[in-house]
Structures are given as structure tokens and as C-alpha cells.
Regions:
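Short beta-edge/loop segments at beta->alpha junctions of small alpha/beta modules
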Residues: 2-79
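Nucleic-acid-binding surface
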Residues: 62-177
């Protein structure tokens, strides 16, 4: 793939606010390339700092303007087709229920597989939930983020369900739950 063709194609998507791509997205965007050629082209684009490999199979277009939700966009791309929402320590720190703010970590509940993904922007920690979709939708709110955000009581319940450490919880803030 020619570098200029790649930049022009990726620029079109970035103008629509899209800057995080799964390998399968790129395979569809550059369908004239064989998988082997595409992998070699992606390596060249990463080596020339046009793309950054966020995690296995997920790439971020460096020339695109980015919002403050890059980890959430990466999460959505990693677990496309699954329900995912910010919860646990990340949500509770936003609500002021726990005393420490996780600076380099995003904690997310997902109906997909759990796992930890180290990216150049921080760590994404995915924890599997078997909660029904209706419970997930009722226990979350829409924000400016590309993925939903747990309500305070949902995040607290998730923290207790998965057996996480609760010693950072500010009990004075729990009275509002």
C-alpha cells in the first residue's frame, strides 16, 4: 500500500471523528491488499509513526485529532459487538466514592472476555460480567464517552461482585448511594 493512499484514506475517516481501527476495519478499507501485504504495510505505517499499535490488532491514526476518550475508543474497538461500560474504580473515583484516581488505568465491565491491555495511553482492564443486557442498560448512563458509564450504585455493586478491594471507599460518600 502506498503511504499517500493510506494517509488519504485514514484522513477521510478521521474527519468523521474516527481514529481507532481494528485490523479487520483496515482489511476492509484496503481490500485490494492481501492479508500478508496489509500486515507489512501496517508495520511500515507504524514504523513511520503514521499509526500507533495500541494493542494486538488495534491501531490509532496519529494524524487525527483526538478527544480525551482514547482509552474508551480502544476499548470499544477491542470488544466490538459486546456491551462494555466504565465501572469499578474508574467510575467510583469520578463519583468521589474512592479516594484515589486511577491515572493510567481504565476499569471496564464487559459482556465479552476479560483481560488487561497495555496501551501507550494507559492500561485497559476488562472484567467479564454475566449481567443481562437489560440490567446493564438500566445501570448505566450515556456520557460524552463512546461507551456507557456505570451509575454510582452499579459501580459499587460491580466492585463488590468481582471481589475487589473496598478499603479505599469513602463511607461518607456512600450515604448518597
Amino acid at each position: 500500500m502506498d503511504k499517500l493512499v493510506a494517509i488519504n484514506t485514514l484522513d477521510k475517516f478521521s474527519h468523521q471523528g474516527r481514529y481507532v481501527f481494528h485490523f479487520n476495519d483496515l482489511k476492509n478499507m484496503f481490500s485490494d491488499e492481501s492479508e500478508r501485504t496489509l500486515k507489512a504495510s501496517l508495520k511500515r505505517l507504524v514504523d513511520t509513526n503514521i499509526l500507533t499499535r495500541a494493542t494486538q490488532g488495534v491501531y490509532v491514526y496519529n494524524r487525527a485529532p483526538k478527544d480525551s476518550f482514547i482509552l474508551e475508543h480502544i476499548t470499544k474497538t477491542i470488544r466490538r459487538g459486546e456491551y462494555s461500560y466504565v465501572s469499578l474504580e474508574s467510575a467510583l473515583s469520578q463519583y468521589g466514592v474512592i479516594s484515589q484516581l486511577p491515572m493510567d488505568r481504565l476499569t471496564v465491565m464487559t459482556t465479552g472476555r476479560g483481560g488487561e491491555f497495555k496501551t501507550p495511553w494507559g492500561v485497559i482492564e476488562l472484567t467479564h460480567t454475566q449481567r443481562p443486557v437489560s440490567d446493564i442498560l438500566n445501570g448505566t448512563v450515556e456520557t460524552k464517552s463512546p461507551i456507557k458509564f456505570a451509575k454510582r450504585e452499579t459501580a459499587l455493586r460491580d466492585l463488590q461482585r468481582v471481589g475487589r478491594n473496598t478499603h479505599l471507599i469513602d463511607t461518607r460518600e456512600l450515604k448518597n448511594v
